[in-house]
Curated annotation (Swiss-Prot):
Keywords: Initiation factor, Protein biosynthesis. SMART domains: eIF6. The gene is eif6. Pfam families: eIF-6. Gene3D superfamilies: L-arginine/glycine Amidinotransferase, Chain A. One of its GO terms (molecular function) is translation initiation factor activity. Binds to the 50S ribosomal subunit and prevents its association with the 30S ribosomal subunit to form the 70S initiation complex. One of its GO terms (biological process) is cytosolic ribosome assembly. It comes from Nanoarchaeum equitans (strain Kin4-M). This is Translation initiation factor 6. Belongs to the eIF-6 family.
Length: 208
């Protein structure tokens, strides 16, 4: 598995600036050509659309989904929606927790949507749209920012308990527990924030 470290827009929380659906991706417009090349080469991406969502650069904060469908909040602008539709089938939802990517995480391997108990009502709606099973977690931590996975593994915040064999607790960015916000991941590689330590990288490579 290919591994790279970068900083985006001066931030090591690089997962906030992209959404990866295995070989296609949504990336923030603030990502430079050099950063985009590193992400594309490391993850082996075949298609990329660059945009904002709701006028903000943190596109990863607003998207959940899978390769054939992504879900975005109703705060998205029309021109942004049109860009996404160049690569994805898109569904727009009117929800309270419009930072979908921060609050929810869909894991294709097990067809599970992870959500906090207190977001159960909205999570049920989203799980239905994804045709996924719902996995509720008793936590007040942002679930989407705390999880990231591929076909082998679900990496998660050590402060969240997940009773799944392939779920492994890790940190990135020098102890950052919000691993979903700290990385971009697919089956071919992982790009992490530049603060990620050598020990954290070794632990990652051992898992994969």
């Amino acid at each position: 598995m290919r591994v790279n470290k970068i900083k985006i827009y001066g931030s090591d929380s690089i997962g906030l600036f992209g959404y990866i659906a295995n070989d296609i991706a949504v990336l923030s417009e603030v990502i430079s050509k050099e950063e985009e090349k590193i992400i594309k080469d490391t993850l082996g991406l075949e298609g990329i659309v660059k945009t904002t969502i709701a006028g903000t650069p943190t596109v990863g904060s607003f998207i959940i989904g899978k390769k054939d469908l992504i879900i975005v909040p109703s705060s998205i602008y029309e021109e942004e929606l049109k860009k996404l539709e160049e690569l994805f089938r898109v569904e727009v939802v009117d929800v309270v927790n419009n930072a979908l990517g921060n609050n929810y995480y869909y894991w294709p391997k097990k067809n599970l949507l992870f959500a906090a108990e207190d977001t159960k009502k909205e999570a049920k709606l989203l799980a239905k749209k994804l045709n996924a099973d719902l996995y509720l977690i008793d936590t007040d931590i942002e679930v989407g920012s705390s999880l990231i996975g591929n076909s082998k593994m679900l990496l998660h915040n050590p402060d969240i308990y997940i009773d799944i064999e392939d779920a492994k607790p890790v940190t990135l960015n020098m102890g950052d527990k919000f691993v979903g916000a700290a990385a971009l991941l697919n089956d071919k590689g992982i790009v992490v924030g530049s603060k990620t330590t050598g020990i954290e990288l070794i632990e990652l490579q051992d898992l994969f």
